[in-house]
Amino acid sequence: MINKKIKQQIVEALRENLKKYPSANKMAIAIGINAAQLSRILKGDWENVISDASWLTLARKFDIAIGLQSPIVAAETETYKFIITQLSLCQQQSLSAMLCDYAGIGKTFAARHYVKQHKNAIYVDCSQVKSKQKLIRQIAKEFGVDHTGRYTDVYADLVYYMRSLDHPLIILDEAGDLDYAAFLELKALWNATEYLCGWYMMGADGLKKKFERHLYNKKVGYAELFRRFGERYQRITPEGKEALEEFKRRQIAIVAKANGLTNIQELYVKTQGSLTRLYIELQKIKNVA
């Protein structure tokens, strides 16, 4: 059961998020409810408008802590600053880039945080939408474009809408999970919005290996897509074991201090430098406190 305090936080997040969309109807599509329901919720009518499951989905979408979860304070780690700068450039100048780096360094957190604060920027977790149709429909949904009709209509409407937006940005996280047809469709969508949309593809070693393998085997489409995304695999972490460990230690220290913790060495040992694991440790500590 979602209590009133959590619902109030969700409504505040909805009001803030509404600033990113040209209309309430567009945002309603993006968050998965209808415009009438959204209108009632924003006016304070919360009872029996949407299900608890829908409230839970909204809480997750806006990173609102529920139950035993506690909010985590964002910290400007090296990863955070690098990605925020890259995303800003890609959006402002309609550029495309690819980032391939270790898991657990804060790539996803930085990308999602950027999207919260910038109009016409969307985040897509490709591990959840691996096929061509699911990917394009999800992109359409995030922009507030109808995504439930015939696929050809959804694609055409999406292209038309993207071309009308002021500097849209699409962030593709876990892009290495996309299937071949989805990659080809990405190339087509990139072509249809050339110079009008920024793109940022992120992943770990799997994304880099996928491109390297298909480029080596000359699989159709990969060379063209690689060229469109800058023809290089960017990374944040330094080369060398010692330098990498020091990098991770610095990031752990920055996030821990931002969240009021001082036992840096203990946290580093427990997490092995992973910010994902640090999040779990922070939840444990805050729930005990």
Where are these regions (language model features)?
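A short, basic N-terminal segment
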Residues: 1-93, 283-289
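Walker A/P-loop nucleotide-binding motif
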Residues: 92-113, 127-128
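Conserved catalytic segments around the Walker B and adjacent sensor/switch elements
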Residues: 118-128
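Conserved P-loop NTPase "ATPase switch" module shared by AAA+ and STAND
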Residues: 161-182, 186, 193
